[in-house]
């Protein structure tokens, strides 16, 4: 039995607790593995709840959906942060979110929701502005006195 696989001790055998703890890995979330902040497991659960009982949801579908949601959220927050800096405040309000979304052409098409407390985008139609330009007003003022 010297040098064989039988018996106790030695290297590589099936003996007791030797080497068993080394193979244990700490559990890693799917969000951590994908390098995301959004919860992949929760999104997978929501996706499974949305499809019918016959259909299945692949594991990578949840990762892909979480990545898309995280990217869009980061994009909106970056634009809203820029809007809050323009107003010289440190807190992002619903108004800043609305200005960020409506100011970006692609996000405006994507997000059609009404944001509570966001207000409206100021816009005056060209037909309502009047036909007088700055040149006409200055020449009209100089021509008036008689």
Swiss-Prot record:
Protein's organism: Tetrahymena thermophila (strain SB210)
Biased composition (Gly residues): 1-19
Pfam family, one: Histone
Post-translational modifications reported in the UniProt record: Phosphorylated on the C-terminal half. Acetylation occurs almost exclusively in the MAC.
A single cellular component GO annotation: nucleus
Upper lineage: Eukaryota, Sar, Alveolata, Ciliophora, Intramacronucleata
Disordered: annotated span: 1-31
Gene giving rise to this polypeptide: HTA3
Location of N6-acetyllysine modifications: 5, 8, 11, 14, 17, 22
Family label: Belongs to the histone H2A family.
Annotated protein name in UniProt: Histone H2A.Z
Oligomeric and partner information: The nucleosome is a histone octamer containing two molecules each of H2A, H2B, H3 and H4 assembled in one H3-H4 heterotetramer and two H2A-H2B heterodimers. The octamer wraps approximately 147 bp of DNA. H2A or its variant HTA3 forms a heterodimer with H2B.
Subcellular location: Nucleus; Chromosome
């Amino acid at each position: 039995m010297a040098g064989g696989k039988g018996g106790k001790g030695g290297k590589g055998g099936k003996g007791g607790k030797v080497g068993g703890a080394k193979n244990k890995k700490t559990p890693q979330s799917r969000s951590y593995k994908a390098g995301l902040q959004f919860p992949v497991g929760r999104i997978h659960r929501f996706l499974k709840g949305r499809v019918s009982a016959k259909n299945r949801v692949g594991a990578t579908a949840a990762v892909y959906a979480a990545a898309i949601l995280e990217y869009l959220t980061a994009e909106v927050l970056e634009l809203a942060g820029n809007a809050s800096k323009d107003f010289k405040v440190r807190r992002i309000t619903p108004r800043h979110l609305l200005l960020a979304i409506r100011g970006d052409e692609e996000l405006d098409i994507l997000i059609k929701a009404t944001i509570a407390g966001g207000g409206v985008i100021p816009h005056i139609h060209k037909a309502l502005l009047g036909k007088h330009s700055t040149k006409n007003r200055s020449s009209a003022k100089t021509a008036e006195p008689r």
